[in-house]
Amino acid sequence: MTHERQQRQRDPRAAQCLALVFALPAWCLGDERAAAEKVNALAQAGNDSITEQYQPAQGISGRVTIVGSDTMQPLMAKLAAAFKSFQPNTKFGVEGHGSSEAIREFMLGLSLQHRGDKSGGKGTQGASSSDLLASSRPLTEQERKGFVSHHGYEPIGIPIAMDAVAIYVHNDNPIQRLTLEQIDGIFSSTLKRSKGGHLTTWGQVGLKDQWSQQPIHLYGRNKKSGTREFFKHVALIDGELHEDVQEQPGSASEILAIAQDPLAIGYAGVGFQSSMVRIVPLAHEAEGAATLPSAETVANGRYPLARPLYLYVNKNPKEKLDPAVSEFLKFLNSRQGQETVARANFYPLTAAQISKNLELLGQSLVTARYNGR
């Protein structure tokens, strides 16, 4: 990465500009009717409907600490804010520094979050453990075993939204479609899909004229990212990323880098789309139709890089779950919770997925009334 680009990324004015750029699309999606229509569209695609309204329990208070995915941080912040509109006596701490690092914290019952309410500890550190883990990938078997080894019981994991990892290019790039084989040829050093070798110029993926000899500049996420692991697993068939990938600490910084580089290509969650960049339609195979991520193409599997977003709960089976955490989980699986997912530019769950979640969580977690206890 050039010194000039590093300076631009450290410029606080660039960060402020980026915050505005990403706040605007999310705000535009905030219309209640649009969110409801998105939920209904997905329900129709799956021949089901999400009808259960959130019924707030009385007397809920306390603090909920969530660690996890950079991709999910904006989603969790919006869900927390929506929940607080029903339960104003609750407080939330949401960290989003990457799934892989957060999983380690969750396994060990740690949180690096500073807090000023002084509850649950002395001084400003306060939060010594995380209640929930937001992860853009499922826990590995080794990670599950690590959690059990430390806590003595299994974590509870549920999907709370659907997402798609999108392929982003500069807004001026005319590329109309890519296949998974081409994605492997562009990003991978191990080429488990690609039969045509490494693809290093835009002409090799179909662009002509002044684009044909231009090099492809690669951008991606760093090793703390669950999105990176998902991309390697699905798009590259557990292959390795090319050493030329310029790894970024977060999705927002990656999108900013792509917006500043006309020859760029990168991958990030669909929730980070903006007017500065463009999402490329993807096809499973060369002869197949290329699709953009949408509620329908994610639900029916036509979009190749669809994925669930997970929330893991640290619940000792011998103890009652904290009322604030339990009520928040109930909210996530309600119509209002899933409409918040839609407003955050992610895709809501189907009713079948909601039903499985409620069954897994158990009746005591999602329907109990605590009355302040």
Model-derived features with residue positions:
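N-terminal secretory signal peptides that target proteins for export/translocation
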Residues: 1-12
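Structural motif marking the loop-to-transmembrane transition
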Residues: 11-14, 215
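Bacterial N-terminal signal peptides
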Residues: 16-26
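Flexible loop/hinge segments at secondary-structure junctions
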Residues: 31-373
